[in-house]
Amino acid sequence: MTSKNTLIAMTMIALGILLALIGYFSGGRWLILKDSEGLYVPSNTKLVSQSYALDAFTSINIVNDYGDVEIVASGRDFKLDTKVLEQADVTYHIDNGTLTIETMAKKKDGFQFGFGNLSSPSIKLYVPKDTKIEAIVIDSNFGDTAIHGLQYQQLNLIQDYGDITFNNTTGDRTEIRQSFGDLTLQQLTSNGFTIESEHGDIDIDGTLNGQSTITSSFGDTTLHLQNKQSDVGYDLKTDFGDVTINDEEQSGTVTQVTKGEHQLNVSLSHGDIDVSLK
């Protein structure tokens, strides 16, 4: 039988995690850490910065334990900039055209969270402008993910805690699974699109061609699309919330059947759906 002290300890830990997450999503940054021994404040919160010139690569694989991840298409060079608690937390290598980056805390049996007035640990990857990446795989635990100006064939992004931001990106196939955080995609063009979100708002501005599927448990979904309404078949439904198409509020499940190849499916448990089409 679980002792009273154990129950109290578990409750306090859960409360600490909840408060830390609230602080993080309110704009806070890393300060309190947790490992198998419990909560602690790191003795050194100063970030170590380093820049690495990289050889060319065609695919990207990122496994991120903590910190923000940013990929930018800019200039003519392949480059990696890092800001982490310890330089040993970041490793990278290129094998058969695939760049693999891993960021892991020194105490690998724990995880990190917290809030305070600190700069965010981060990795920032630069690829030459107009480069088309074959495949991108990102598995991120804590931290925001941002992609700017990138072209890719396939992207698979798994994000546990943190916001996701895309700007001016083009992809043949995009798959995103997010647990906690908002998703904002601006100037996006995709030919196949899948989003699974548990908690957070979804805001997309761009063109969704082919089969596009969005499912969410909690949060609103807003789509400002450049597609013509007559070219898109759609199936929009929310269990608790409103559905609006081109500023016209409708109730229940809203569908349109077309013979074309472009299909949009949005299914929410709790939240509003707002879609605008040309």
Predicted regions and their residues:
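Right-handed parallel beta-helix
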Residues: 44-59, 68-77, 90-177, 182-186, ...
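Short, polar loop motifs at secondary-structure junctions
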Residues: 85-87
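A broad, low-specificity signal for short, low-complexity segments enriched in glycine/proline
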Residues: 24, 32-33, 40-43, 58-65, ...
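Alpha-helical transmembrane segments and their membrane-interface anchoring/capping motifs
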Residues: 1-65, 70-74, 132, 246, ...
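Short, surface-exposed interaction patches in beta-rich subdomains
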Residues: 168, 174, 183-278
